[in-house]
């Protein structure tokens, strides 16, 4: 007992420092590569327009689309969370990744075609076109920004902090602030194109580093068979606490689950019940993959629909890998370091990783620190930084788009392109400030399973949004009143579960939560199913009791009318969607433009450099403003969803092949 406590104390306080030349050289080379790609995209891409900054000019081909989808989804939270939950409970958490193989195809084949023909930049913007009014769009924008700041950013910050603590021993605040600063630089300067090119580079870095560590881990444990032979025996040697209130700890708290090798588990006693995993997770994944701004924005930047579908397929194939690159290495970490990763005594866990409820979240960082040689350890740090920066940059850019296009344009409907771009950049700076201010909260809340935390919060808030998007696309009869009250009713139900769970805490096996069973006993994915159908029923019921939306307002806004050639009359068309045209001076628009140009003094050299750095230089466009006819032609091209028949068949066959592979793997590990 005493020997282990002292060992835990040493592990908790003396970290392995990455201070050798090989590691430092690899890390420096990685950062130079990322910054170089960001600077290259500044020269190459058009960042001086709202479409260029927020949608990469609709010019991305399939492979950066797919790589960016994968890299934006796989953050440091996946390395820490998937490996940690794998260490704690086995293979089932990989179902979160393999479920996405089917949902990402729904995105490319069902949802994106409608988003394209609608001609929208953001998801709240689509709902405004579909239903009219302001309240749904504003509600969804605020909800999305809330989720970005308090779940996505907090999870990435926490998981990045765990890795930095374990691997570097640096001051956590200085390290994370430096990461945020570098991320902010290429987000602010490069726009979405910079993110998608750097995402592509970082995808290869992430996969290369993860493959190398997986090889070392399997070699150490005795191969694939060694993992399955030894995992059920990976038990900590310390099971007695000095705290009289805890005392002898039940074996159910530290023994690996008997069903650890199965994806599909008992519908009542399973940690991830199979009905909840198949249906409840699909609902939450549908929100994330088909209506979340971070993901959909990558698809909307695709060159055409065929490239978007191919990118979704590539992302699906990449999503096969986390089972073998994250979940299984997490299980191996428990086998190799059971007294640390599988600790159960609260005071020992506190010494090992700084939290009393368990240390499974250190599973992946512990492998890196213990197994990787010099140089490769630096590579893995670069991998984790790549994942953290990619995820944060995606959130910064997408939240900037939401705030600028959906909230700020309500306050300043006549704002010009330059004003919108400036506000978008300033919002990124604000998000960075909020992230840094949130660090103490994240550091103090190091309890429970990281992956369970983010999935449970999503399960309480996202299903109403999923229900409304599904009904908006596939049920033309649904109207604004039904959608709005469906969202509000679902929000109230979700908060009725979320608030008690946060108030009482989720607890642990050693110290269970005091949350009343009526609120907290139902598994969060089962609750997602209930919430989805209740919200959908409320939406349909209210829509049936109120006036329908005339079909003239629905052309190319619902799936059944996506190929309609009739002119659509947008609801609330009088509301300005973007920058207002220049004022007319004595009946002459050109005269007013000329007067504005005369009245604006030429910027100095320093200001010109700053404007170019932020993508706001007038000279960057190199051409006069487009005419009305050119704008209309560009709009028609961007909204085109026609496909080359031969390439469409190739893409469809690849989608069928990917689904076949997915079904086989689900069956093999079921």
From Swiss-Prot:
Transmembrane segments annotated in the record for this chain: 21-42, 62-83, 92-112, 135-164, 172-193, 194-215, 274-293, 308-329, 374-404, 423-444, 450-475, 481-503, 522-545, 650-668
> Which cystines does this chain contain?
253-509, 343-349, 353-359, 515-520
Q: Which domain of life is it from?
A: Eukaryota
Cytoplasmic-facing ranges: 43-61, 113-134, 294-307, 405-422, 476-480, 546-649
Give the record's subunit note.
Answer: Forms a heterodimer (via TM13) with PDZK1IP1 (via N-terminal transmembrane helix); this interaction enhances SLC5A2 transporter activity.
| GO function terms (MF aspect) | alpha-glucoside transmembrane transporter activity; D-glucose transmembrane transporter activity; D-glucose:sodium symporter activity; metal ion binding
Q: What does this protein do?
A: Electrogenic Na(+)-coupled sugar symporter that actively transports D-glucose at the plasma membrane, with a Na(+) to sugar coupling ratio of 1:1. Transporter activity is driven by a transmembrane Na(+) electrochemical gradient set by the Na(+)/K(+) pump. Unlike SLC5A1/SGLT1, requires the auxiliary protein PDZK1IP1/MAP17 for full transporter activity. Has a primary role in D-glucose reabsorption from glomerular filtrate across the brush border of the early proximal tubules of the kidney.
Tissue expression remark:
Kidney, in proximal tubule S1 segments.
In terms of Pfam families, this protein maps to: SSF (PF00474)
Binding of Na(+) occurs at 71, 74, 387, 390-391
- UniProtKB keywords: Cell membrane, Disulfide bond, Glycoprotein, Ion transport, Membrane, Metal-binding, Sodium, Sodium transport, Sugar transport, Symport, Transmembrane, Transmembrane helix, Transport
Which family does the entry's similarity section mention?
Answer: Belongs to the sodium:solute symporter (SSF) (TC 2.A.21) family.
Kindly give the membrane topology term recorded for this protein.
Multi-pass membrane protein
| Encoding gene (name) | Slc5a2
Gene Ontology cellular component list: apical plasma membrane; brush border membrane; plasma membrane
- The glycosylation sites are 248
Q: What is this protein called?
A: Sodium/glucose cotransporter 2
Q: Which organism is it from?
A: Rattus norvegicus
